[in-house]
Every structure is written in structure tokens, then in C-alpha cells.
């Protein structure tokens, strides 16, 4: 097993979004392991980011973004999808999280296909809601300590040769920030 990636220190959310690319997101369910290489992320900070859930302050939904780094912030959107984020913030920005937008499936393909009800590998984890569904990530994992957890964690993976940056997807504010990163 790859050693776990430790995100215990305060680091800028945008830097962590880049660092997560190429790492492996792992989900253990009983004796099954599902994993994928992180291929796309988005950074969401605090007071300088009107697209962030943390922009207007702490709420019951976003409280994880204000708490310990390295924990999961999972939220429900569009009435049907969960999205998984890793809390990452700096001393300058007291809240933040990195949305994991896409994965390249690595292990547990059969279970991913079953969870997503599709055989199309290219469609399994090609969006934040799809990957959460494929890895069976729900609000039950909200606040999960990704560094210490045995059911949801991140390990070393590959070193990206090139990282592409562009504006984030599906937002109406903060469009000038090129905080969508992909390999």
C-alpha cells in the first residue's frame, strides 16, 4: 500500500489543489477497495472567493471547511449528488476545501460499475457526483479524517508531467480565478 499523504499543515488551498493531482483517493468498504488517481481538482477558499461555500461564514453545512485540515467535506447538491472535498486552508484564509472533480479508476472497477450502474469506464468517475457515487461516498463520510481513516484516504500516486489551470466549472462568481486544475 502506498504511504498516506499527510495534509496536516496549514497550506494555501490553491497549492493543495495542485498537490492532490496524481494522488490516489482510496475508499474501503468491508473487504473491497475502490480507488482512482485524482485527475481534476478545484480550490475554494474563504473571504476572497465568492464561489466558496465558506464565503459568507460558517453554517451547519460548511462547518468542516472551518475545522481541521485533512478532513472530508462532503455535501449534497442538485438534489441527487454528493461531492467530496478535502479541507485545506492557510493562516491567511481560515476556511477552504479542495473539490475532487475527477478520477482515473485504478481498483475496484466492478464495484464502481455496480455503484454507478454503467459499464462505461470513461463515464465512471468523470465528474464530482459520479466519482462520489462510484466510490460510495455520502454524507456519512462528512468530517472523516482522511489522514487517519481506514475507509477514506489519499495515498501517493503519480507525479504529473503537466498541470493545466482554467476557471472553475459550474459557478457564477469568482470566474476570474483559474483554480480548476487537471492533468
Task: Give a label for each model feature.
Residues 1:
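Short glycine- and acidic-residue-rich catalytic loops of nucleotidyl-transferase/cyclase enzymes
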Residues 4-183:
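Conserved, well-structured core segments that form or line functional sites
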Amino acid at each position: 500500500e502506498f504511504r498516506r499523504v499527510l495534509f496536516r499543515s496549514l497550506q494555501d488551498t490553491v497549492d493543495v489543489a495542485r498537490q492532490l493531482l496524481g494522488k490516489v483517493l482510496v475508499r474501503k468498504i468491508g473487504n473491497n477497495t475502490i480507488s482512482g488517481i485524482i485527475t481534476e481538482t478545484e480550490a475554494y477558499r474563504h473571504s476572497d472567493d465568492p464561489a466558496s461555500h465558506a464565503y459568507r461564514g460558517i453554517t451547519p453545512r460548511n462547518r468542516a471547511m472551518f475545522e481541521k485540515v485533512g478532513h472530508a467535506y462532503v455535501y449534497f447538491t442538485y438534489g441527487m449528488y454528493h461531492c467530496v472535498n478535502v479541507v485545506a486552508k492557510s493562516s491567511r484564509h481560515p476556511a477552504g476545501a479542495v473539490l475532487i472533480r475527477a478520477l482515473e479508476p485504478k481498483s475496484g472497477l466492478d464495484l464502481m460499475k455496480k455503484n454507478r450502474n454503467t459499464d462505461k469506464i470513461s463515464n465512471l468517475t468523470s465528474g464530482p457526483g459520479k466519482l462520489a457515487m462510484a466510490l460510495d461516498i455520502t454524507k456519512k463520510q462528512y468530517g472523516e479524517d482522511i489522514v487517519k481513516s481506514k475507509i477514506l484516504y489519499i495515498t501517493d500516486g503519480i507525479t504529473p508531467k503537466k498541470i493545466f489551470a482554467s476557471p472553475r466549472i459550474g459557478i457564477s462568481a469568482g470566474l476570474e480565478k483559474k483554480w480548476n486544475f487537471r492533468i
